[in-house]
Amino acid sequence: MSRLVYFSSVSENTHRFVAKLGLAADRIPLRPTEPFLRAEDEYVLIVPTYGGGNGLGAVPKQVIKFLNDPGNRSLVRGVIAAGNTNFGEAFCIAGDIIAAKCDVPYLYRFELLGTDQDVLRVREGLGRFWLQRSQIPA
């Protein structure tokens, strides 16, 4: 298990962003016929925002199922969200929802595939995040 877990729809936008990060990552299955993913270590979740801007259905059902597993939920340490600025106020709202429900920091948000600058910021930010977490006394 890596320190990144992500979900990507058939559009593959989030998958392409994660691939550009060049970091090990585990993907939450798209289809219910695929094996269920169980987290084995602390991780940051990268998730797209669904919906048309009203916030309803913003968190993909597959992500909800993944986080409803007590073991998976207990290991999430932060969230990064993708979205579409056309959603207005609901831009990347899936990150807000997950951060609030799981009581974890909302680390970053980016649009669609993300820019090269987004990739750099996330890669560097994750490095700092895990370093800081390693310095927290148990």
UniProtKB/Swiss-Prot annotation:
It comes from the Bacteria. SUPFAM superfamilies: Flavoproteins. Pfam families: Flavodoxin_NdrI (PF07972). InterPro entries: Flavoprotein-like_sf, RNR_Ib_NrdI_bac, RNR_NrdI. GO terms for biological process: protein modification process. Gene3D superfamilies: 3.40.50.360. GO terms for molecular function: FMN binding. Belongs to the NrdI family. PANTHER family: PROTEIN NRDI. Probably involved in ribonucleotide reductase function. This is Protein NrdI. It comes from Beutenbergia cavernae (strain ATCC BAA-8 / DSM 12333 / CCUG 43141 / JCM 11478 / NBRC 16432 / NCIMB 13614 / HKI 0122).
